[in-house]
Amino acid sequence: MTQTLADMRRDYTRDGLTEAQSPDEPFALFHTWFDDAVKTEQPPVEANAMTLATVDEQGRPHCRVLLLKGLDTQGFTFFTNYESAKGQQLAARPFAAMTFFWPTLERQVRIEGRVEKVSAQESDAYYQVRPLGSRLGAWASPQSRVIADRDELEGLIRQTEQRFADTQPHCPEHWGGYRLLPERIEFWQGRSSRLHDRLNYRSVDGRWTRERLAP
C-alpha cells in the first residue's frame, strides 16, 4: 500500500540540546553545528545549502535554496545577481530569513535579520575563485527574466564566451554579495514525540540573549 502524506513521519532520537551545551552567543554554536554537518551529511545534501526567504513590495514571501559562501561575526554571506527577483526584493525591503536543515543530524537553524550588500572588493574576491563557467554565466544570464527557451540562454552564453575569448571576465556590477546581519538565530534539535529542543538567541542593543522556546 502506498504510504499517505498523513502517515509520513520519522521520530527524532539522535541527540538533545541543553543550555549547558550552548554558549552565550550563537556564532560559536553555529560553527560547531556547521562543522558537524560538513563531516556528517552526505550527497545529495550540501551542508552549506539554505533556504532564503525575502518579501516583495506587496508583502508576498518568496523563498529559494542558495549556498552560504561566507560566515563571520558580522553575519552570513551569499552571492547573486543584484537585478534578480531576490535582488529587487532586498533593495525594496532589506530583511530576510535563512533556514539550514541537516537531516542526518536532525538539526535545523533559523536566522532572521537585516541584509546589506558586501563591498565590491569582497564580491570580486569571491567571483575570481568561481569556475570559469560560473563567471561567464553571471554575465550571460538575465536572471529571473522571461526568456524564449533554452536556445536563447545558450546563445547568450556563446556571445559571452566570444566577448571574453581573449581576457578573463571581471566581476559585473550587477552581481555580488549580500550579508545577513542576524537579529535572531534559533537552533532546533529534533527529539522524540515531537518534543524538540529549541534555543533562541536574540540580539538586543548589540548583546545576545538566549531563551528556550516550547516545541
Swiss-Prot record:
Xref: InterPro entries: Pyridox_Oxase (IPR000659), Pyridox_Oxase_CS (IPR019740), Pyridox_Oxase_N (IPR011576), Pyridoxamine_oxidase_dimer_C (IPR019576), Split_barrel_FMN-bd (IPR012349)
Binding site for substrate: 9-12, 69, 126, 130, 134, 194-196
Any GO BP: pyridoxine biosynthetic process
Cofactor comment text: Binds 1 FMN per subunit.
Role summary: Catalyzes the oxidation of either pyridoxine 5'-phosphate (PNP) or pyridoxamine 5'-phosphate (PMP) into pyridoxal 5'-phosphate (PLP).
Cofactors, names only: FMN
Domain of life of the source: Bacteria
Name used for this protein in its record: Pyridoxine/pyridoxamine 5'-phosphate oxidase
Keywords assigned: Flavoprotein, FMN, Oxidoreductase, Pyridoxine biosynthesis
Enzyme class: oxidoreductase
Residue numbers binding FMN: 64-69, 79-80, 86, 108, 143-144, 188, 198
Family: Belongs to the pyridoxamine 5'-phosphate oxidase family.
Subunit architecture: Homodimer.
EC number(s) reported in the record: 1.4.3.5
The keyword Flavoprotein is assigned to this record: yes
UniProt-listed Gene3D superfamilies: Electron Transport, Fmn-binding Protein, Chain A (2.30.110.10)
Pathway assignment: Cofactor metabolism; pyridoxal 5'-phosphate salvage; pyridoxal 5'-phosphate from pyridoxamine 5'-phosphate: step 1/1; Cofactor metabolism; pyridoxal 5'-phosphate salvage; pyridoxal 5'-phosphate from pyridoxine 5'-phosphate: step 1/1
The keyword Flavoprotein is assigned to this record: yes
GO molecular function annotation: FMN binding; pyridoxamine phosphate oxidase activity
Catalytic activity: pyridoxamine 5'-phosphate + O2 + H2O = pyridoxal 5'-phosphate + H2O2 + NH4(+); pyridoxine 5'-phosphate + O2 = pyridoxal 5'-phosphate + H2O2
